[in-house]
Amino acid sequence: MPDSLQITSVAASKGPDDIEVEFLETQSIGKESDSTHAASVMIERGASCMVTLGGDGTNRAVAFAGVDVPLVPVSTGTNNVFPVLVEGTTAGLAAGVVATGAVDVAAVSTLRPMLEVHVDGTRRDLALIDVAISRQPYLGARAIWDVDQIEELFVSGVYPTSIGMASIAASLPVAVSEGLHVRLGPGGIAVSAPVTPGMFSTVPVAEWSPLPFDEPKTVSLSSGTIAVDGERSIVIHANQSAEITLVRDGPRVVSIDRALTAAGRAGGFVR
């Protein structure tokens, strides 16, 4: 795909001559579908591992390609939960030992859950971290910050270090680590959550319950917008029905620590 900053070409020019580098010739329309298409092409070309540079949205777009290739998601922004902050050299090394078969992929990676959004029985979107149901009737700037407009929240897991909507679920006194369904509003408790970097909000929570796998939950709000991983993407009308389902078959994510540990123990770095 287009690389206006020439990150890949500069990196390739400084690498060993015996490493073959192929650049994908794909058209860009400046939307998240560019990442989905690029991932699809890589899968077709037989990629053994993919490194993603971006945030939750970038990885969500890659997941749309039906990725069954291990991912090394590297965070390049703020307010992210799915990708990790890691030094690029070690991330690339982990991807290398996975791609070359130097380690057992199943032993050094985890199949992450995700949330599917269905409207009137058709899958319209997915989220890797959270789905927020907002009373706001239009998409607008897409990014969702106003907690007062949130009716309910679905999370794929309880992530203690999360920022954003998922931090609300992580601030609850719960023992589960998997999916959770949270209804916001009066009548319950209030939690302090970092919904934006550097800022904490007091959020009223009416109730919460575990979100079992493969059991669709109907959205209670009759009209409004659905935000996936922090961005509004779908408008729902009064004559429509929306459901959120937690599924197990999300992206397979490489643990950089486990991959490098396994490679080292196997003598992969001995020269």
Predicted regions and their residues:
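ATP/NTP phosphate-donor binding region
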Residues: M1-C49, F64
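ATP/nucleoside-binding phosphotransfer catalytic cores, i.e., glycine-rich phosphate-binding loops
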Residues: T36-H37, G188-R271
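Gly/Ser/Thr-rich loops at beta-strand to alpha-helix junctions
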Residues: D3-I7, V51-N59, T76-N80
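Short, acidic/small-residue loops that bind anionic groups at enzyme active sites
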Residues: A61-G88
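ATP/pyrophosphate-binding catalytic subdomain of soluble kinases
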Residues: V103-E207, L211-P216
